[in-house]
Amino acid sequence: KYLAFLDNDHSGQTRRLIDVITAGEANDGAKLLEYAKSPDPSTRYWAAVWLGVNKTADGKATLLKLTADPVPAIRVAAAQALYRLGDPSKLKLLVEHINDPNLLVGMFALRAIEELGDAGKVHRAKIAAAQKSKYEFSRRIARRLTTKWR
């Protein structure tokens, strides 16, 4: 996971990330769909995030593909984006990522569930268990949700 640091010149990746975020801010769905195919995980992640933020209806098929991405954070971002597009079918995917070995992914999943309102309530037990997470922010989110859903 640290191989990126072996390359001294990150200007290409930096430029690409600026471009994908700028495309998101401009609501340029066509560019975001192209960036979602990038070999760079950071670029795919931000494309998925912005497709959801902008509720890009043309992005649904791409987001469905991204829910099977090899990178867990991208799967979470895609599932959250689909929910924003009115597709709740990947809620279970978010719940499955709560206990991801990468603690940030678990926190991202919990935060996405929190943003969905009461939809995650059916998974209350698994969310409540996250109050014992090693990551403080995951514990906080799980505690907020558990308290809210009593």
Show which residues each predicted segment covers.
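N-terminal segments that cap or nucleate solenoid repeat domains
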Residues: 20-46, 50
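Residue-level detector of extended alpha-helical repeat arrays and alpha-solenoid scaffolds
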Residues: 14-15, 44, 75, 106, ...
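Short inter-helical turns and helix N-cap capping residues of alpha-solenoid HEAT/ARM repeat scaffolds
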Residues: 10-11, 39-40, 70-71, 101-102, ...
